């Protein structure tokens, strides 16, 4: 199971939000490229980037910072990116820039046809980001709750050729309250496509609990605030996940 460091970008800086609230941002670094390189040097096998401004604006905003990260990382590890991706031109531009996987969130919920087109145009490189609160999907940078049940919606996307589902529990994101194992496992069990867990991964116990259910289809866990504030040592977390994967 991959432990995936998150780099959330706001106004060109690396930040973390609590429950997706832009006004509750903590700046962790003003040099996104250096931060990305740090996680590679610590043994990271993949990076998770989010253009937070883009998620709210509905178009790319932090492209400069994203290019700096790609340049710093080079071809060392894959990078997945979400936030503000609403058209095929944006996807193509990011992939040309060196991003490995593009995460379609709001646009997948509002325009399933667009998601289908994206999967057809860029096979193996499109993920779906489903962000949920109490089992209901949120859109537009988490600012609006829909009536869609997260499992029902994810199952509709299975035949599209989606590479993975990035599932975020909004209520736990950035709160250091522990991962929602039950909801994550329920989603993974309902799908044939892999799930990457996000939101609330706080300590080694969370990593252990997720790694123990990896066989249900959970291929990774994204962590942000915990590795920046020190409640989780990234290198230890990946080592534990690797160890449990071999049992």
Curated annotation (Swiss-Prot):
Query: What's its catalytic activity?
Result: 1-(5-phospho-beta-D-ribosyl)-5-[(5-phospho-beta-D-ribosylamino)methylideneamino]imidazole-4-carboxamide = 5-[(5-phospho-1-deoxy-D-ribulos-1-ylimino)methylamino]-1-(5-phospho-beta-D-ribosyl)imidazole-4-carboxamide
Listed InterPro entries? Aldolase_TIM, His_biosynth, HisA_bact_arch, Isoase_HisA-like, Isoase_HisA-like_bact, RibuloseP-bd_barrel
Where is this gene product found?
A: Cytoplasm
A GO term from the CC aspect? cytoplasm
What's one Pfam family here? His_biosynth
Question: Which one GO biological process term can you cite for this protein?
Answer: L-tryptophan biosynthetic process
Protein name per its UniProtKB record: 1-(5-phosphoribosyl)-5-[(5-phosphoribosylamino)methylideneamino] imidazole-4-carboxamide isomerase
Where it mainly occurs, coarsely classed, is cytoplasm
Which pathway does the record list? Amino-acid biosynthesis; L-histidine biosynthesis; L-histidine from 5-phospho-alpha-D-ribose 1-diphosphate: step 4/9
Keywords on this record? Amino-acid biosynthesis, Cytoplasm, Histidine biosynthesis, Isomerase
Family matches, as HAMAP family: HisA (MF_01014)
Active-site residues? 8, 131
Q: What is the lineage of its organism?
A: Bacteria, Pseudomonadati, Pseudomonadota, Betaproteobacteria, Nitrosomonadales
* Enzyme Commission designation: 5.3.1.16
